[in-house]
């Protein structure tokens, strides 16, 4: 039986063995995926696999098994490759079948040639995803995943060397600026006993060629959020690629390809003019974007991939499995004290305002659970008004949210940002790629919009479009990507919290006026002491609590539905002027999240009454503030 080092360090040997034992027309490909699926089910086996998120690519062994936790930022056109091909020895006429799956270049021995006219050749199709690390992923998520990796990963899983010779070859071929080389040093690949002149590309022109122009400007890795770091990868998917879509978060396991020969092949192909220019329709920019140097954007040939149900690594990946059900039931049994502690923690963060803390909890566990026509059900955008202007208070509130959720981003709503930032992803037809924007986020990302930063000024056309995009995101939970000739709707599920001085310029589902009970003499010191006072184990319980409750099912019995309807009719009768259908909808939302926050998956009469009470208190505050200001909030 193969040892750990075989399937981790040399997965090609496993694939070759399975391929050799089965005829190409059999289900050898399924046997390969089944083999690795079983291997990864072994105790802690997934943690043995080196992660591109944690280990620099130049420390990873080429053609070894790696994993990558990522978001699909773009999908390129499908490409053709030689799934099976035949080599022939000109001297002995001996023929050998090879597999081309999981490879960028076809392999053949020093005395072999590929028979391009062989009847055994099988041309297949694969899909390429351009993947980036999860935008706005919290530091605690990265640290937790890295701690698992460092604790379990055996020393055989990767080689801590830079493969210096291969890198220098790659460096000469790519001719990228020195700064970029230092940041993204990559490793070369082994030749597998095959001289470079004998190596041929397995890709045909099904949309693009692997060409990397010389002397090109630094490569834009196309991260949605400014200041993001980490690897971008071309992820080659062979099975069930139609089950994935743009913005999905995936965990992929596959074979790492960082072979500098890709640059050789592509440069020679471009310079030798072997291809008819009429047949090569790709622009230089498209070739550069779709076939970047492998040292900068490595390739992963996927053996297994699955879409993540949530972003929190403290929870089991799939909550439907038996072990996961035990985890959930154990946590639910201690839910009440966790909620009480979280409420106390957020109350202190919100300067003693327990009502605002209640609504913040409801906001943080909200999620779009369904869509009725165009209406997203379950969104709960909260506008926290009454925040001090130009204060570090809103910055620290965001830092606290960062410590609680797996992914987040703080958008400072300044005139400068609104007029100059790219919010909406757009299609670049010259490079044939989707250029990312700030609003290209993974599902359940927390977006905190800080309106206290807004000063007087003039929005230009781009600024107006950006404000409109934020409004559409909040109201419809969708972003209209710009495809020049038309707009394409991309549904999303983003938790939006707006912090503002007065009522927000943006729409919201619920406005909560902050009423501080304490004014700390030193706000920074006060906020910092909050986080240092919380034990890491307690913080982890808060994180599990907020992620888990989003995933619970919820229902309202016929009996309670009838009682709610009767109650609403009575409310309208008593106050026909101010009670509207929107009030009913909002109170039902509050009741939903209030029930879930207590671990109850059905609405009770008590929770309905508590929701009405919270709403009455919230409205009374707004009315009080309106009277103080003498105008509409």
Curated annotation (Swiss-Prot):
Location of the region described as Disordered in the Swiss-Prot/TrEMBL record: 154-198
GO cellular component terms given for this protein: nucleus
One matching Pfam family: MCM_bind
Biased composition (Basic and acidic residues): 174-184
One GO term of the biological process aspect: sister chromatid cohesion
Keyword Oxidoreductase among record annotations: no
Domain of life: Eukaryota
Record has Glycoprotein as a keyword: no
Main location: nucleus
UniProt keywords, alphabetically: Cell cycle, Cell division, DNA replication, Mitosis, Nucleus
GO MF annotations in UniProt: chromatin binding
Localization (cell): Nucleus
Family in the record: Belongs to the MCMBP family.
Function: Associated component of the MCM complex that acts as a regulator of DNA replication. Binds to the MCM complex during late S phase and promotes the disassembly of the MCM complex from chromatin, thereby acting as a key regulator of pre-replication complex (pre-RC) unloading from replicated DNA. Can dissociate the MCM complex without addition of ATP; probably acts by destabilizing interactions of each individual subunits of the MCM complex. Required for sister chromatid cohesion.
Subunit record text: Interacts with the MCM complex: associates with the MCM3-7 complex which lacks MCM2, while it does not interact with the MCM complex when MCM2 is present (MCM2-7 complex).
The protein, known as: Mini-chromosome maintenance complex-binding protein
Species for this entry: Gallus gallus (Chicken)
Lineage start: Eukaryota, Metazoa, Chordata, Craniata, Vertebrata
């Amino acid at each position: 039986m193969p040892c750990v080092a075989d399937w981790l360090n040399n997965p090609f040997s496993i694939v070759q063995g399975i391929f050799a034992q089965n005829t190409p027309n059999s289900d050898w490909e399924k046997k390969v995926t089944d083999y690795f699926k079983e291997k990864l089910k072994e105790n802690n086996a997934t943690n043995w696999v080196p992660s591109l998120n944690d280990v620099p690519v130049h420390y990873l062994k080429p053609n070894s098994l790696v994993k990558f936790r990522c978001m699909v930022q773009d999908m390129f056109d499908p490409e053709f490759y030689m799934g099976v091909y035949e080599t022939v020895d000109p001297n002995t006429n001996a023929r050998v079948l090879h597999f081309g799956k999981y490879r960028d270049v076809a392999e053949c021995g020093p005395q072999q040639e590929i028979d391009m006219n062989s009847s055994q050749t099988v041309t297949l199709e694969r899909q390429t995803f351009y993947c980036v690390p999860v935008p706005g992923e919290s530091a605690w998520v990265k640290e937790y995943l890295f701690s698992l990796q460092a604790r379990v990963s055996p020393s055989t899983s990767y080689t801590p060397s830079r493969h210096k010779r291969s890198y220098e070859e790659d460096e000469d071929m790519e001719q990228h600026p020195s700064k970029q080389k230092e940041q993204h040093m990559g490793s070369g690949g082994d030749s597998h006993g095959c001289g470079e002149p004998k190596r041929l590309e397995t890709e045909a022109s099904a949309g693009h060629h692997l060409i990397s122009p010389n002397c090109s400007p630094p490569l834009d890795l196309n991260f949605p959020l400014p200041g993001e770091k980490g690897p971008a990868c071309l992820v080659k998917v062979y099975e069930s690629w139609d089950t994935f879509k743009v913005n999905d978060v995936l965990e992929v396991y596959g074979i790492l390809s960082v072979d500098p020969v890709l640059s050789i092949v592509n440069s020679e192909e471009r310079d030798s003019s072997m291809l008819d220019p009429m047949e090569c329709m790709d622009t230089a920019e498209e070739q550069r974007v779709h076939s970047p140097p492998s040292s900068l954007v490595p390739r992963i040939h996927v053996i297994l991939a699955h879409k993540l149900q949530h972003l929190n690594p403290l929870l089991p990946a799939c909550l439907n499995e038996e072990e996961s059900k035990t985890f959930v039931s154990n946590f639910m049994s201690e839910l009440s004290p966790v909620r009480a502690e979280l409420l106390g923690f957020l109350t202190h963060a919100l300067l003693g305002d327990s009502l605002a803390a209640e609504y913040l909890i409801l906001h943080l566990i909200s999620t779009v659970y369904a869509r009725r026509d165009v209406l997203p059900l379950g969104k709960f955008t909260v506008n926290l008004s009454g925040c001090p202007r130009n204060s570090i208070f809103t910055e620290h509130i965001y830092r606290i949210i960062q410590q609680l959720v797996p992914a987040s981003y703080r958008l400072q709503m300044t005139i400068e940002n609104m007029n100059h930032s790219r919010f909406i992803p757009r299609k670049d037809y010259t490079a044939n790629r989707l250029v990312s924007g700030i609003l290209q986020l993974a599902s359940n990302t927390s977006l905190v919009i800080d309106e206290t930063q807004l000063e007087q000024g003039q929005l230009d056309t781009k600024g107006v479009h950006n404000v409109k995009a934020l409004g559409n995101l909040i109201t419809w939970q969708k972003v209209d990507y710009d495809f020049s000739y038309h707009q394409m709707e991309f549904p999303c599920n983003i938790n939006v919290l707006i912090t503002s001085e007065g009522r927000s310029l943006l729409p919201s589902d619920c406005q909560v006026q902050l009423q501080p009970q304490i004014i700390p003499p030193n706000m920074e010191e006060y906020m910092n002491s909050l986080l240092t006072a919380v034990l890491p184990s307690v913080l982890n319980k808060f994180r599990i609590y907020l992620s888990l409750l989003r995933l619970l099912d919820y229902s309202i019995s016929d009996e309670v539905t009838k009682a709610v309807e009767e109650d609403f009719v009575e409310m309208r009768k008593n106050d026909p002027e101010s009670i509207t259908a929107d009030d009913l909808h909002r109170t039902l939302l509050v009741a939903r999240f209030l029930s879930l926050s207590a671990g109850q998956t059905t609405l009770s009469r008590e929770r309905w009454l508590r929701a009405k009470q919270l709403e009455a208190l919230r409205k009374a505050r707004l009315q009080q503030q309106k009277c103080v200001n003498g105008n509409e909030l």
